[in-house]
Amino acid sequence: MGMNASNKIATFFKYFVLILVGIIMIYPLLWMISATFKDNSEIFAGIGLWIKNPTLDGYRNALNNFGGSINILQAMLNTYSYVLPKVICTVVSACVAAYGFGRFDFPGRKLLFNIMLATLFLPQVVLNVPQYLLYNKFGWLDSPFYLAIWVHCAFATETYFVYQLIQFMRNVPRDLDEAAAIDGCSSFQTLYKVIVPMLGPALVSCALFQFMWSCNDFMGPLLYVSTPGKYPMSLFVKLSMDGDTGFAWNKILALSLISILTQLIVFFCAQDQFVEGISAGAVKG
């Protein structure tokens, strides 16, 4: 009886802590949702979730055009115009690069791998100026296809994802490569017929990370996009902050909520594979 009582107490305490941490983590999102239905005075009156005088003005104002050239639907379309190519290029290039480093021995392999890892320690702010000058030479600034934001991802420049896939690939037995070679598969056939299907969860986790990071990216569009009609959601929310008339925080929070809805939907649809990819990639280092 003593052991059962202590186990029940431990279980209760464990779930109590988990529920408490969960509430603390989700409360800001719940508060943001409730604040979209409040006016400024009620928003700053406290941090409670209760809505005394609900209003839809925040959502009505969020759907208005700003400067006559862009609205929230156009901003969302602009966002996914570069997010989707960036995700695809990142996953494909990182997978190919990881396959090369993880499965082949070639001269200078360790040196190139160490150089690649060293780029992880370079802060993005150091690269902003040379990248800006280079893309200006190419004529990619303010491109209608947002080339300056995503084209570099086609060359496996997202080192974090290359490293993550290499760690996951170490869990794939090399016997499968040898069996595929015996069956007459080339290296690329082995990659997309054998390796890629087994990397499914890891590829999903890479795609989700890049999708969320790209949707939330503010500095990239700020540097390379200058036409208001091409602004993505990150710049559109900033554009909605009109300092002359005062901040309508319900409108700003409504825009913020709408901007993250797609990310939440995508994450919850793929969360099982996402968790599996993250955990499986950490089995071997």
Regions found by a protein language model. Give the residues of each.
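A structural signal for multi-pass alpha-helical bundles of membrane permease subunits
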Residues: 3-285
